[in-house]
């Protein structure tokens, strides 16, 4: 009886072990951690230009003036580690300085922000091992659409949420809205990763694989955010070594960790499809044997 149970358990766990082995093999072959390091470096160079462009877009639409402040607080409270307040002050100071730049300098900021999106495009297509390339004009249009529509849609969603919460007559509804807003960071991460894994690769990505990979990445991102915040508060080694400059390595480690999660979600997405193809090929080969 016990032997039968072990045999059944082995049959159920064998596909999981095979998939995990394939996942690890792809992570090693794609040099995922090196790609994450490259993206972290480009992200740090593009962070201030990207935020400057986003805030400039909000400034161009007066109806989003109040929402831009809420969006700033929401991003730094939900997508940054425990030192988000310090990082926010520094970044806002850098952005304020960038607003004094000339038109040529502003164009340079936009180009730098677009370079980050190009780096993301290259990294994800490296993981998908896609040989196809998009026309440059089409790629630029996609990058620009993400750069402009993304922040505006986020601002619109926050404006709607604030409006609903301001309706005092809907006291029964406020409890439901509070619960929705509590899971909003996870939901936004899930949707963002799903769009990233579905749109950016130049090859066709099965929707269910993108949903699963995005969900795992979103869960790891939320868990990593809380774990990183706990590490910073419980083991303040960076503050002890670097003092007031501790925000620099903390930000770099957090950005690197974030890109590791994003690329791991991409590896999971592509491995699900590859494992399914390998399994179907093995079953077909077994069926063809006399």
Curated annotation (Swiss-Prot):
Protein name per its UniProtKB record: UPF0761 membrane protein YihY
Which family would the database say this protein is a member of? Belongs to the UPF0761 family.
Q: Does the keyword Transmembrane helix apply?
A: yes
Q: Which InterPro entries match?
A: UPF0761_bac, Virul_fac_BrkB
- Mind telling me which GO cellular component terms the entry cites? plasma membrane
Q: Which residues cross the membrane?
A: 44-64, 104-124, 140-160, 183-203, 210-230, 244-264
Topology of the protein relative to the lipid bilayer: Multi-pass membrane protein
> NCBIfam families, from UniProt?
PRK01637.1, yihY_not_rbn
**What species is this protein from?**
Salmonella arizonae (strain ATCC BAA-731 / CDC346-86 / RSK2980)
Subcellular location field: Cell inner membrane
Q: Where is the signal peptide?
A: none
**Which one Pfam family would you cite for this protein?**
Virul_fac_BrkB
Family matches, as HAMAP family: UPF0761
What's the chief localization of this chain? membrane
What keywords are annotated for this sequence in UniProt? Cell inner membrane, Cell membrane, Membrane, Transmembrane, Transmembrane helix
